Amino acid sequence: MENRRETLLLQITGQLNHMTAAIPRGPKSAFRKVLLGTDNVRGLAELILDHTIKAISKGTGLTTAGEGLAIEMNKLTTFNLKSGTDRKVKYALISAGVEAFGSLKSLSYIDKVTERQGVMKLNKLDFISEDNLLFYYFEEQLTISELELPKEDYTYWTHPRKDGRTIVKKMPKSLTSQYTHTKMPRVYAALNAYGSTKFKVNEELLSVLMQMDEDKHMFIPKTIDSEEVSGALYSLMKFRRISEFVGEQAKKWYLANVSQQLMKKGLTTVQIDGRSKKYSKRKASGWFKEKTSEPLDLVRASSKRYEFDKVTFMARRMRNKTFHYDFQLDSRGRMYPVVNYFEPTGSDVAKGLLIFKNGVPVSDNVLYNLAIHTANCMGEDKLAMEDRVLFVWVHMDEILEAAENLTNSEWLNQFKSEKKTKFQLIAAVLEWKKYHEQGEDYVCHLPIGLDATNSGLQVLSAVTRDVIGAQETNVINHPDQEIGDAYMVIANSVLDNGFAYNNYEELDSKAWRKLCKRPTMSYYYDAGRECIQEQTYDDRRDHGVDVLSRMTFDDASYVGTAIYDGVESAFPRQTQAKEALKAGVEEALRNNGGKALVTWKTASGFTAFQDYSRIETGRVNCSFAGKLVQLSFQLFIDKPMKSDHSKGISANFVHSQDAALLSLTIANLAEKGVKSFMMIHDQFSVNAEETSLLLETFKETFIEIFEEDQLGDTLRAFGLQTNPVGYGDLDIQDVMEAKYIIS
C-alpha cells in the first residue's frame, strides 16, 4: 500500500508542478492562485489523494467534496480562499476544490459522473477504469481513508480551533468568542476527559463476528447484490412519481364525494380545499409507504451490511493498538466523534467491539455491575436491579454453554430481535467466560452502561417540576411501583380514551408498550401526527407481534393518531412547555432584526443556537481537467425560516439540556478520578467498578442543573416576559434518592 501511495503522490505532485509552470499571466483561477501561494505542493497532493478516496467511498457530491478539499488546501497557501462575501467564498472554495480533483482526471484516474436521484442530478467522482493504480490503492484501503480512523494520540482542546476543526461544528463566526476555554471551562474539561479515554478493540468479539460472518449467522447482515439495490432505488423513484398521481386522484374523489356534505355543515370553499389537500397527502403517503416497503427493506439491509463491513474493517485496522476519539460539539452542545462507523456513539456492533484499555480487577461490585449490564443487553432492563442480577445468575449455565460455541448457540439465537444490544450481549457473554476461566485473575475492560428513561420526558418533567412525569421517568422514586414506566402510562391513556380498532385493544401490555415507545420519544421532540403515523407503520415489524406486522398504512394512521392524542393528554405540563418554547422563539425572531440566529445559554456555559436560514441556489463555473463544468450549490441567507424555528426549538432545547447534563457529569466524574468514559447522549458508561459513583454523580449533576429554572431562563432570554407554563411541586432534591434515573 505504501509503495502505491508514494507512486500516486509523486504523480500528483508532478502534475501540480506542471500546472504551476503553465500558469499564464493575467486573471487566474482560485486553484492556480493556491498553487502560486504554496511552498508545500506535496501537502496539496496528499490532500487531493485522501479527499478523492474519501469522496468516492462515501459517494459525496462533487460540490461538497470540492469545498471540503479547498478548506483544507487553504491552510497550505498564502492565498486566502475565504476572503469576500459568503457567495464569493463559496464560489472560490468549490471551484478550487473541483479544479484540484481535475489533476487526477488529467492523470486518467477519475472522471466526473452524473447520477440521477429522482428529478435531481448529483455530480460525483468515479474511477475511469478499475484497472489503474488509484483503483488498486482504493481497494487496498477498502474505502477507509487514513483521515477516518481513530488516532493513537490525543491533542487536547484548549481553544475553539484545533487541527483544522472548530470545537462546534458549523460554528457561526459571530459566536466564536462564546466558545473559548474561559467561557465554558467545564465543557472543555468534559471533551478532553472523553477524548483522552484509551480504547482498544475487543479482539475476542471481533474473531467471533468474523466466524459468524463466514457461517452466514442470522445475526450478521446479509450481503445484498448491487443490482438488486439499484433496482430497489429505481422502484422508489418510480413510486414517488406515481404517488403524486395517486394524491391528485384522491383529491378529485374527495371533492366529488365529500365536499357537498362539508358545505352543508357550513365549511367554506377554502376550508374544504384545505381538507382535500390533507386527505390527498395522506392517501399519497399511504400508497407510497405500502408500495415502497419491500424496496426500502432491501436498501436498509444493504446499508446495514455496508455499516457492518465498515466497522469490522476499521476494527481490524486498529487491532493491537491503543487509540482515542476526538469529539466536536453540535449546535446544542451534544458531543459527536470526528470518526464515523467504528466509534462509541455508533451501532451495536461498534459499541460491542470497543473496550477500555484500562480494566478493573474482579470484585463483587464488578460482577454485580457486569450482571446488570448483561441483563440489560438481554432486554430485561425493566426488572429491579437485584432481580436483573438474579436473572443472570439463574441463566449462568446457559450463558457459559453458549460462550463455548457462540456461532451455533440456540440460547443466543433467541435474542436476534434485540436490535440495539445483541452484539453487546455477545461481548458480555465472552466476559463471563473469561471470568470463569481466570477466576481472581480476571480483569474487566468492558464499558458498563446505564441508560436514562426517556431523556426528553425526564428533562421536560424536571424543568416544569412535574411530579407525575418525574415518577414515571424515574427522576424520583415511584410511590406505587419499583420502576416508573412512561410508555405504559401513554398506552393506558390511549386505551382509557376508548380506543377500539381491529381488536388491537386486546393486545397485551407488552405489545402496547412497544407501540407507544418511539412515538412518545418523538412527540417531545415535536413530531406531529403525520410523523407518528409514519413511525407506527415503519416499526410494525419490529414488535414481534404478528397482527401488528400486518398493519396497513390506514391502520397505522388510526393507531398513530390515537397514540399522539394519548401522549398529548398524558403529560399536559410537558406539552405546555413545548408550546411555550415555540412562543419564545417566535418572540426572539421578532426582536432579532431579521436575523436567523437564535441563542440561549445552558448550565454548562455552552451557548446553544439554532440557525434555520432561507436557502438560495447558486451556480459556479469550474475547470475540471481543462473542461468547463457548471455546478449548483446551496447558500444559506441570513433570513429566518420561521416555521423551521418553531418546529425545531422543542427538540433543540431538550437536547441542549441533556448535552449540559452529559458534559457536566463527565467533568464532575473526571474531577473524582474517573479516566474511562463511553457516553452516548443519554447513555452513560464507565468501567465496572465505578457505576455506583456514576449514578451518584449523575444525580448530583441533575440537581445542580435543574434546581435552576432552565425553562424560564431560556424563555426570558428569548424575550418572553411571562412564562405561560404552570409548574408542579416537584422537589428537585428528591432526585438524590432515585434508584432508576439511569439504569
Where are these predicted regions, by residue range?
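Non-catalytic nucleic-acid-binding interfaces of large nucleic-acid enzymes and RNP effectors
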Residues: 1-520, 524-652, 668, 672, ...
